[in-house]
């Protein structure tokens, strides 16, 4: 690619992104006026008010989020991310991501944290009606009609997790909120560990500040999907770490990855598409003849099949769940949502969640190793999109892919020009804070 084409590509991507978002907002408002069953309220995003979800408001926690963003900007300007040890980069990113997302949610007070966990459509509301764990798994497909919309749209795994928490005395809404907070931090750390294993220390340091202020953090803190994202991220990290290890160690990394990805399949059906990311890493490892690749595959496949087999023995076959959820999906709002709009609207919602720095990064990223992660996630997202299984609500549904795409923004950050990192963080944080102030999200 010639130099002028390289300069033109990010500009073209930004223009296309702006056009997609603008069209989706304008067309979405028209769609909402003529289709009262669209149930979005802030198309292409979802608002808590299904008529008009755009509610400008101010919370003092947004000032806190702004101050945290300024701290990250200052750290970029002073070169802090490049000087400190890796453990401090991981810790700062993990804690920063949790704090930034929490401060955004707190702009609506405690309700901003609780609503996504205790709403009647969410998982927690189903504990009272769900039978004991064994019976719940065994009858899940046959009795799927009795549960709320989010349980009907997912495998039974997260309800089982809530049942376990309830059994050990961690009942109620706040343990669920804590899971989302923890999932946000774990995701950031796992993604950085993967980037380090795949592309090296410098790319990890470049990506770190962007994971703190990513706009998709708005939805990480207020939905169970934060747990799904964390489990998937840990699985990818286990694969990445195992590939370069000796066979004796690699097989155990593979087992860990298999357990994590096997579990992910029973938390969200999209876990199957996320497998494209570790699959690309494994193919690259085989081509490079990395010593641990075959052991990771063997351990991962064995452990993953063991998890699937355990659920099958308990009475739940994954493919039956997929079919039941597909039927439920088209009995709900999906039947009233026009694909002609969501073909673009879904992409627009994803662009909003990822932020403009990610879009620019996709245009300038040249590292082949980074593209293993970014490209795998983009392919997984595209597969989900073209399945027509997601029409709207993708700012939450596609959270499982967003961190792996967001790291493309690291390509705009240069160690030699510290203002690049400061500017990138400032832009992403501003987008997140303004969006939180304008949108009263359902999650």
Name these PLM-found stretches.
Residues 216-228:
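Short acidic/glycine- and proline-prone juxtamembrane loop motifs at membrane-interface regions
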Residues 70-74, 349-374, 378-385:
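Hydrophobic, aromatic-rich transmembrane alpha-helices
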Residues 212-219, 235, 251-269, 273-280, ...:
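Membrane-interface alpha helices of multi-pass inner-membrane proteins
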Residues 71-77, 175-198, 206:
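Transmembrane-helix motifs of polytopic, lipid-linked glycan transferases
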């Amino acid at each position: 690619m010639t130099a002028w084409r390289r300069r033109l590509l990010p500009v073209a991507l930004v223009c296309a992104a702006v056009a997609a978002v603008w069209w989706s907002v304008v067309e979405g408002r028209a769609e909402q006026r003529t289709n009262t069953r669209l149930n979005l309220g802030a198309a292409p995003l979802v608002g808590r008010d299904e008529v008009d979800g755009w509610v400008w408001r101010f919370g003092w926690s947004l000032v806190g989020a702004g101050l945290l963003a300024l701290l990250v900007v200052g750290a970029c300007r002073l070169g802090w991310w490049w000087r400190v040890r890796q453990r401090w980069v991981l810790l700062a990113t993990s804690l920063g991501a949790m704090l930034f997302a929490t401060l955004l949610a707190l702009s609506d007070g405690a309700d901003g944290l609780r609503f996504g966990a205790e709403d009647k459509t969410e998982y927690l509301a189903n504990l009272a009606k769900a039978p004991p764990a064994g019976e719940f798994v065994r009858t899940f497909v046959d009795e799927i009609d009795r549960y709320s919309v989010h349980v009907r749209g997912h495998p039974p795994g997260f309800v089982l997790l809530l049942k376990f928490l309830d059994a050990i005395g961690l009942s109620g809404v706040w343990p669920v909120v804590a899971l989302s907070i923890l999932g946000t931090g774990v995701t950031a750390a796992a993604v950085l560990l993967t980037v380090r294993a795949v592309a090296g220390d410098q790319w990890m340091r470049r990506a770190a500040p962007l994971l703190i202020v990513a706009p998709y953090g708005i939805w990480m803190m207020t939905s169970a999907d934060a747990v799904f994202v964390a489990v998937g991220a840990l699985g990818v990290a286990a694969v990445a770490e195992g590939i370069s290890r000796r066979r004796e160690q690699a097989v155990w990394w593979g087992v860990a990855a298999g357990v994590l990805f096997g579990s992910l399949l029973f938390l969200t059906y999209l876990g199957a598409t996320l497998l494209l990311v570790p699959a690309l890493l494994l193919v690259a490892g085989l081509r490079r003849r990395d010593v641990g690749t075959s052991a990771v595959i063997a351990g991962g496949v064995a452990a993953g099949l063991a998890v699937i087999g355990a659920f099958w023995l308990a009475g739940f076959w994954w493919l039956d769940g997929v079919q039941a959820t597909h039927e439920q999906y088209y009995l709900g709002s999906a039947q009233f949502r026009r694909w002609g709009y969501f073909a673009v609207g879904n992409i627009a919602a994803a662009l909003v969640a990822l932020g403009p720095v990610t879009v620019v990064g996709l245009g300038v990223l040249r590292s082949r190793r980074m593209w293993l992660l970014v490209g795998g996630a983009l392919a997984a997202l595209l597969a989900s999109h073209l399945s027509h299984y997601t029409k709207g609500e993708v700012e939450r549904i596609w959270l499982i892919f967003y961190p792996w795409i967001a790291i493309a923004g690291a390509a705009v950050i240069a160690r030699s020009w510290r203002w690049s990192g400061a500017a990138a963080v400032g832009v992403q944080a501003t987008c997140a804070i303004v969006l939180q102030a304008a949108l009263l999200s359902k999650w």
